[in-house]
Amino acid sequence: MDEKFSRRYESFCNSLKALAEARKRDFSDSFVMSGTGAKFAITFDLAWKVMKDILIQHYAIIGFVTGSPKEVLREAFKVNLIDDDDWMEMLKVRNELTHDYDGAVVKAHCEMIVGKYIDLFYEFENVVKGICQINE
């Protein structure tokens, strides 16, 4: 993989590590909750871009019409990088968070972010390590 991929993957791993810190925080604090939502969105965006890089560079899949997150997720599912349903659900949450002006959306999804989505990011991280033969 190229240097751009390496930087993006490293950013994804760092963002995931920071997001995982949310598991140790008090969600009664609105600042913690909004920070968790923002970090989730950033981590998700880095993840789908890493997927796109892998699809192009490792699988030579270049038939994306627009290269949108939804298209990338569908292609990533086809080659077993991810489980489609969970990641499509994550995309929906990420899109909803974009328009969360009063904190209601992040409040509704914080439990899923911390309880499920972080683990899905870690699963993806392990898949990438295996495909790209990345050592810790």
Where are these regions (language model features)?
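Solvent-exposed interaction patches of small proteins and small membrane subunits
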Residues: 1-136
